[in-house]
Amino acid sequence: MPDIDKHKLSLSFSRAAAQYDAIAGFQQQVAARLAQLLPAIPATCVLDGGCGTGTSSALLTRHWPDALLLACDLSPEMVRQAHARQLTAVCGDLEQLPFSKACFDVVWSSLVLQWCQPQLAYPELQRVLKHGGRLLFSTLTSGSLHELESTFGEIDRHRRVLPFASEQQVVDALYAAGFEHVQCQAERWVTQHADLKTLLTSIRGIGANQTGAARRPGMMGKTQWQAAQVRYENLRDADGMLPLTYSLLFVSAEKSRAQD
């Protein structure tokens, strides 16, 4: 995973915070799918890591109504949106969490860890979990956004999509961080869009434009933009829509019950 500029990432998501809920239908569907995998285990303290505006936190509260729910996000504006939902939320990076050791029974994170360095984030998540605690998250893996990568890559040769980890790399990194009983469920989701501009807005509009894939047309030149539109038109599906593929991975892992 490349070294992502977290300051730029935070600013990008902060700019998108006010409109995020209106655009992030895909992200909300992924969170709902992850919620279907929540374990029937007791929990007194739960963390929503990378909470965004806090919409996913309601899923956790519904599952563990008596638990203390804390949330964190890299973006100050996202945290403010979460506060408006009466959530206890703080600014925090999953690679350097502002919480003490072994304080959560469950850590949840939906579509956030693809932005993180696994060798930093996974040990941090393991650190803040209690022994026997559970980590549940969704992330993107290799093959995601391949239509964008091929379309734009053949035009200007610039990488416009993150080099997402493979499922095996995710599993290996979790075990290397000290997790046990790692279970994964891979799913391929395809979103449909009327045109390329709308497709890119589904990414850029939620702040996820640090991949480079959602750069504005004017930044790449009119001729290149028109060439990209022509190339992507060849991908229209049977419904007459432009597809965008997400290789999703839903993961559950456990921190060892043995004391350090």
From Swiss-Prot:
It comes from the Bacteria. GO terms for molecular function: carboxyl-O-methyltransferase activity; malonyl-CoA methyltransferase activity; S-adenosylmethionine-dependent methyltransferase activity. Gene3D superfamilies: Vaccinia Virus protein VP39. It catalyses: malonyl-[ACP] + S-adenosyl-L-methionine = malonyl-[ACP] methyl ester + S-adenosyl-L-homocysteine. Pathway: Cofactor biosynthesis; biotin biosynthesis. Coiled coil: none annotated. Its EC number is 2.1.1.197. Keywords: Biotin biosynthesis, Methyltransferase, S-adenosyl-L-methionine, Transferase. One of its GO terms (biological process) is methylation. InterPro entries: BioC, Malonyl-ACP_OMT, Methyltransf_11, SAM-dependent_MTases_sf. Converts the free carboxyl group of a malonyl-thioester to its methyl ester by transfer of a methyl group from S-adenosyl-L-methionine (SAM). It allows to synthesize pimeloyl-ACP via the fatty acid synthetic pathway. PANTHER family: ARGININE-HYDROXYLASE NDUFAF5, MITOCHONDRIAL. Belongs to the methyltransferase superfamily. This is Malonyl-[acyl-carrier protein] O-methyltransferase. It comes from Herminiimonas arsenicoxydans.
